[in-house]
Amino acid sequence: MIVAIEGIVSKKEPTFVVLKTSSGVSYGVYVSLFCSGNFEKDQKIELSITQIIKEDSHKLYGFLDTNEQRMFELLIKISGIGATTAMALCSSLDTNTFYTALQSGDESVFKKVPGIGPKSAKRIIAELSDAKINIENSNQDHAQALAALLSLGFKQENILKVLRTCESQNTSELIKEALKKLA
C-alpha cells in the first residue's frame, strides 16, 4: 500500500500530476485544484496518498492537506459517491466550507458541485452526520495552531502552507511540527 510519495513534479495539469521519485520511478497522481495550486512544475513535493485498487484500474489520489485527505476518504465511503466525484468535491469546497455545510445541513453547497444532485447532497449530509465531530475538532486544532503561530510573529501565508502539510492531530503537536518546518 502506498501512503506517500516524494518527488519532483515533472508534469502538472489542473487535477493530475506526475511525480518522479529519486529512484527514477514516475507516478501519476490525481489531485484537487486546491492541492495543485500549492506547487509548481519542477518543484519537489511530498503527497499523502489514498490508493484505490479496482478490478480494472489502480489509481493514486494525492493530498498536501491531511484534512482534505480525510474529507476525500469520508466521501468515497458513501454509496454512489466515487473517487471522481469525491475529488470534484475536494476541488470545489475547502474543508471549512465542507464542514460548515455538513453542520448546517446546507444541501445547496453540495449541489453546486458537478455530479452532485439533490439525492447525493442529502445522502452526504445524512451519512456524514457522525463524522462532523472529527472534522470540527480537526479544524479547531488548526485554528488554534494558526493563532498561536501568528502570535509568535510568523506570516499567515507561510503558516497556512505549513499547516496543510502537518499530520499531527492535536493543537500542541501541530504547533511543534509547524515550528520545525517554519524554522
UniProtKB/Swiss-Prot annotation:
Q: Which residues form a coiled coil?
A: none
DNA-binding in keyword set: yes
Q: Where is this region: Flexible linker?
A: 138
Query: Where is it located?
Result: Cytoplasm
BP GO terms, sorted: DNA recombination; DNA repair
* Protein's organism: Campylobacter lari (strain RM2100 / D67 / ATCC BAA-1060)
Subunit structure, briefly? Homotetramer. Forms an RuvA(8)-RuvB(12)-Holliday junction (HJ) complex. HJ DNA is sandwiched between 2 RuvA tetramers; dsDNA enters through RuvA and exits via RuvB. An RuvB hexamer assembles on each DNA strand where it exits the tetramer. Each RuvB hexamer is contacted by two RuvA subunits (via domain III) on 2 adjacent RuvB subunits; this complex drives branch migration. In the full resolvosome a probable DNA-RuvA(4)-RuvB(12)-RuvC(2) complex forms which resolves the HJ.
**Domain III: annotated span:** 138-183
Name of the protein in its database record: Holliday junction branch migration complex subunit RuvA
